[in-house]
Design a protein with these regions (language model features):
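Conserved catalytic-core motifs of GNAT/GCN5-like acyltransferases
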Residues: 116-118, 134-151
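Conserved GNAT acetyl-CoA-binding A-motif
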Residues: 105-119
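Glycine-rich phosphate-binding loop
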Residues: 92
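Acetyl-CoA-dependent GNAT
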Residues: 7-14, 18-81, 85-87, 98, ...
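Active-site beta-strand termini and strand-to-loop segments that position acidic
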Residues: 59-61, 153-156
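Conserved active-site alpha-helix within GNAT-family acetyltransferase domains
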Residues: 95, 121-139
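Conserved beta-strand-loop-alpha-helix junction that forms the acyl-donor binding cleft
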Residues: 89, 115-127, 144-145
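Conserved N-terminal entry element of GNAT/NAT acetyltransferase domains
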Residues: 1-14, 18, 154-161
Length: 161
């Protein structure tokens, strides 16, 4: 599957807020909405939109169905958030999206060699999405916000497609 990828624009893509149903809010922690999350990280010290922080929206059949926010930090890519449109959940699209994202340098301009993501232990559906995309459970991360599960993806290929 080749999705169409576009840069997230908070002014024209407010419809993404509607994807945050109660289930999504509880499993992502986006209590204040996606736009607030995006604007926080886009202005966070050390992050430069388009340089080491990106947010992309994936389209299928000319309709947006997923958004992914990620950054580059210490020689690895960190997925900060993935949100799939509610009616598209449970169909394997999240895993397919991640595989395409990880293996297509054209989406962000470079090949991802190592990628990490943290996930709430209660978010079993998301854990399966990442595992099906090739991520491996690595360790429990403990901090003041509670436990999270760290998953790691490492590219097995050095191609630059």
């Amino acid at each position: 599957m080749n999705y169409v990828w576009k840069d997230y624009n908070p002014d024209t893509m407010s419809f993404i807020e509607n994807w945050l149903d109660e289930s999504a809010v509880n499993t992502t922690g986006l209590y204040e909405g996606f736009r607030t999350f995006y604007e926080y990280w886009a202005s966070e010290d050390g992050f430069v939109l388009g340089s080491n922080f990106w947010c992309k929206v994936a389209y299928e059949d000319n309709k947006p169905f997923a958004v992914i926010a990620f950054c580059q930090h210490e020689q690895k890519t960190i997925i900060m958030e993935v949100l799939v449109r509610p009616e598209k959940r449970g169909q394997g699209k999240g895993s397919t999206l991640l595989k395409e994202f990880l293996n297509n340098a054209g989406i962000i301009g470079f090949r991802i060699q190592k990628c990490e993501v943290e996930n709430y232990p209660s978010n079993i559906a998301s854990q399966k999405v990442f595992e099906n995309a090739g991520f491996k459970y690595h360790h429990i991360h403990r901090d003041g916000n509670g436990d999270s599960m760290n998953y790691v993806y490492e590219s097995s290929s050095l191609s630059t497609t």
